[in-house]
C-alpha cells in the first residue's frame, strides 16, 4: 500500500477497487483484540465510529460498544472492562469490505458507561499528540547539529507508542555547528511552534506515524472529486484580504533587520476598501542562515494564503483523504474549482453509510 502522504488516486479506480463503495467497513483492535462491527448473539459489536484528524490537533476516535452488559449479573463484564480501560492501545482501519486502510493508532483516553434502555460503553481514543500536549518540559536544554536532531530527541520520550521506525523526517534544512535550544511550554508547543518554524517543517501524526517534513514540499493532490458524483455537499468562504507582508530576520547576533522583499496579498473577486494594503510584520529566526530564512519566509507566505479561502465539504467515504495533502474539487464553479490544502478530516461510518467530511484552505 502506498504511504498516505504520497499516494495519488482517481475515483474510478477507487470505485472499482472498493466494490462501488457499496459495503463500508471498519476494523477496531484494542490491545490486539478485534471488536466486530456487526452483531452476533453474545459478542461485542460497534454500530458506528467517528475518526477526526487534523494537521493542528490531536486525532480522536470515538465509538460505542454494545452487547457488553450482562443482564443477569447486572454489570458490564469484567473481560469487557479489562479490554476497554484507559491506556489500552487502539488501532482503527477504514474502508470497504476486503479493503481497509489503517488511519489511527493511539490509546483509550476515556470510557463512559451509559445505563439506559441499551447499556452502552462510549469510548474515546486519542493519538500521541495528546500526550505531547500534556507533557511540559519547560526549560529543558537540547543540543544537536540540526533542529531535526532535536525533534528526534523529543520523540524518544514516546518510543513506546511511536518507535523510531515510524518517525518520518526530511533531511535538515541546514546542518553545521552544534546548536543549543531551550524548550518553552509543552512538547507539542515546542515542536509545532519552535522547531517547525526554525526548520521550516510541518509536524503531524497519522496512523501511528510522526511526520516532521518539509513545509515547502510540493503537496500532490490525493484525488480529484466532482460535485454531483463524489461530493455530496460543499461550501466555500472567501475572505477580504489586502495586506503587505513585511519580513524581519533575526541574525546570528540576535539583532532584527528587515529583509528587502515585501509581499502583497490581495484576494480575488473583491473590491478594495482602502487604496493601500495593511501592513503585517513577520519575524523569522534564521540566525543569519540565508537558506533557512528563505524557507521560513515561504512558510509564512503559505500561511497567509490560507486566509483567503476556506472551504468545507462532505463526500463519499474515501479513507485516503487525510490532513497534510491536497485535494482537487471540480464542476462546482470556475472560480472555486481547483486544488486546496486539506486542513482537517472526519471519517464517519454509521447506519447511513460511510462519509468523509473535510475542511480546506488556500
Each language-model region and where it sits:
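Well-ordered beta-strand positions in beta-sheet-rich domains
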Residues: 48, 102-107, 122, 139, ...
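Extracytoplasmic/secreted envelope proteins and their assembly/folding machinery
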Residues: 105, 148-152, 188-192, 246, ...
Amino acid at each position: 500500500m502506498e504511504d498516505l502522504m504520497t499516494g495519488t488516486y482517481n475515483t474510478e479506480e477507487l470505485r472499482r477497487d472498493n466494490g462501488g463503495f457499496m459495503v463500508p467497513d471498519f476494523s477496531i483492535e484494542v490491545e490486539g483484540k478485534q471488536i466486530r462491527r456487526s452483531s452476533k448473539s453474545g459478542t461485542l459489536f460497534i454500530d458506528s465510529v467517528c475518526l477526526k484528524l487534523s494537521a493542528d490537533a490531536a486525532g480522536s476516535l470515538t465509538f460505542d460498544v454494545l452487547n457488553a452488559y450482562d443482564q443477569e449479573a447486572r454489570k458490564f463484564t469484567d473481560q469487557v472492562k479489562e479490554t476497554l480501560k484507559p491506556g489500552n492501545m487502539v488501532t482503527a482501519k477504514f474502508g470497504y469490505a476486503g479493503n481497509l486502510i489503517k488511519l489511527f493508532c493511539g490509546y483509550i483516553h476515556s470510557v463512559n458507561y451509559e445505563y439506559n434502555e441499551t447499556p452502552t460503553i462510549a469510548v474515546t481514543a486519542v493519538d500521541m499528540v495528546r500526550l505531547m500536549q500534556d507533557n511540559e518540559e519547560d526549560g529543558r536544554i537540547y543540543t544537536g547539529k540540526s533542529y531535526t536532531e532535536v525533534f528526534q530527541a523529543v520523540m524518544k520520550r514516546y518510543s513506546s507508542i511511536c518507535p523510531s521506525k515510524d518517525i518520518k523526517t526530511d533531511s535538515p534544512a541546514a546542518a553545521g555547528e552544534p546548536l543549543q535550544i531551550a524548550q518553552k511550554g509543552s512538547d507539542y508547543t515546542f515542536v509545532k511552534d519552535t522547531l517547525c518554524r526554525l526548520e521550516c517543517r510541518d509536524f503531524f501524526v497519522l496512523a501511528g506515524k510522526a511526520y516532521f517534513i518539509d513545509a515547502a514540499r510540493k503537496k500532490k493532490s490525493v484525488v480529484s472529486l466532482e460535485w454531483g458524483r463524489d461530493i455530496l455537499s460543499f461550501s466555500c468562504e472567501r475572505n477580504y484580504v489586502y495586506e503587505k507582508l513585511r519580513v524581519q530576520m533575526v541574525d546570528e547576533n540576535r539583532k532584527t533587520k528587515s529583509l528587502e522583499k515585501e509581499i502583497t496579498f490581495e484576494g480575488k473577486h473583491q473590491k478594495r476598501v482602502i487604496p493601500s494594503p495593511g501592513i503585517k510584520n513577520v519575524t523569522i529566526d534564521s540566525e543569519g542562515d540565508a537558506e533557512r530564512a528563505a524557507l521560513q519566509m515561504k512558510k509564512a507566505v503559505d500561511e497567509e494564503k490560507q486566509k483567503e479561502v476556506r472551504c468545507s465539504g462532505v463526500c463519499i467515504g474515501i479513507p485516503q483523504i487525510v490532513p497534510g495533502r491536497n485535494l482537487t474539487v471540480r464542476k462546482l464553479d470556475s472560480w472555486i474549482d481547483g486544488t486546496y490544502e486539506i486542513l482537517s478530516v472526519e471519517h464517519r461510518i454509521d447506519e447511513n453509510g460511510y462519509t468523509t467530511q473535510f475542511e480546506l484552505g488556500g
